[in-house]
């Protein structure tokens, strides 16, 4: 992770962005789901299905953290914010893990706030509640042709499964650093 925050935010929820269903499982757009799955496994969480999302609660340093995978498809990810708000989770207490096509595969960066930069999942979150959330931007690369972006992010990774797993491990390590004192 190439950026450190002056003050570590109190994270109460980690949202992994992606699309539901086996068709999209191992795709660049689902890197958020894959990383949150790995966090859940590391901390022995158990996924529970709700109407529009899947969630698990984990404990890190005696702090409960809600892991969330919206099931509304990427472009409607922001619909989850109402449910999180009812649970007392504000945007400034959320870490959103998402694919970043403007980064080469493997680059990971932490960013507070900002625009969607063309990412429809972020656009939906911002439209439903603002941009105060923290982002873990995970580089998945970009196709040579701009017209191929939609296909690129929803097709299987071009990188090997091992390379993707190494990226997931690095992202989980970065999340652990963020969450531990």
Regions from the PLM with identified roles:
Residues 118-121:
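Hydrophobic alpha-helical segments within soluble ligand-binding/sensing domains
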Residues 1-113, 123, 127-134, 143-150, ...:
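Nucleotide and nucleotide-moiety/phosphate-recognizing core
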